[in-house]
């Protein structure tokens, strides 16, 4: 069994626990070096990075023939997705507010850390929302159907060609919708 298979095997809830653990560890470790607000932002960034890495490993390594079953495993509930969206929006707003509040007297390394944390938080939050929605779209597309009905799906999206969609198709759709809705 490949290492990627082991990493991609946990369902969405186990991934969430791993990401929460990473966020808590980073928060307490960074408190020794950073102010509370910066430690909170670094903690959120660690959480988001773990979720993004694990989700994108799934997106990039899941063969199309197993996506139907994997989509059932990787789906988060609608309530949890709503909570994700609200928390990521708050994290991004907090990061922007944090950037705006920087004192002009702050220079050098402190300003660079401040700026990097802020920019990374916005990028990670934005990417996290669309990645989670891409996984949700795959679940909604295939519905709760079983392997016996390989060519049947709940639908809702139409993909060009005869090839059944894979995770990357749903991620592409999610990011395109996300970018066009933000304009």
Go through each PLM region and give its residues.
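The first (N-terminal) embedded transmembrane alpha-helix
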Residues: 9-31
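Juxtamembrane helix-capping/reentrant segments at transmembrane boundaries
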Residues: 67-87
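Short, Lys/Arg-rich, polar N-terminal cytosolic tail immediately upstream
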Residues: 1-9
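Membrane-proximal soluble regions of multi-pass membrane proteins
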Residues: 141, 147-183
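Alpha-helical transmembrane segments and their membrane-interface junctions
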Residues: 89-109, 174-183
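Transmembrane alpha-helix/helix-exit interface in multi-pass inner-membrane proteins
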Residues: 123-148
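Loop-to-helix transition at the N-terminal end of transmembrane alpha-helices
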Residues: 36-53
């Amino acid at each position: 069994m490949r290492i990627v298979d082991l990493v991609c095997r946990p369902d969405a809830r186990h991934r969430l626990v791993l990401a929460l653990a990473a966020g808590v560890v980073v928060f307490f470790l960074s408190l020794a070096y950073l102010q509370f607000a910066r430690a909170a932002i670094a903690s959120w960034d660690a959480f988001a990075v773990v979720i993004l890495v694990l989700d994108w490993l799934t997106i990039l390594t899941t063969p199309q023939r197993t996506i139907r079953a994997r989509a059932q495993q990787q789906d988060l509930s609608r309530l949890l997705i709503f909570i994700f969206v609200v928390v990521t929006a708050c994290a991004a707003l907090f990061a922007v507010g944090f950037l705006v509040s920087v004192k002009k007297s702050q220079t050098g390394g402190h300003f660079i850390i401040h700026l990097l944390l802020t920019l990374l938080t916005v990028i990670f939050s934005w990417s996290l929302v669309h990645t989670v929605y891409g996984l949700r779209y795959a679940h909604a597309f295939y519905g709760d159907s079983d392997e016996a009905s390989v060519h049947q799906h709940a639908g809702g999206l139409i993909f060009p060609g005869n090839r059944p969609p894979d995770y990357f198709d749903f991620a592409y759709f999610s990011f395109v919708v996300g970018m066009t809705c933000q304009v």
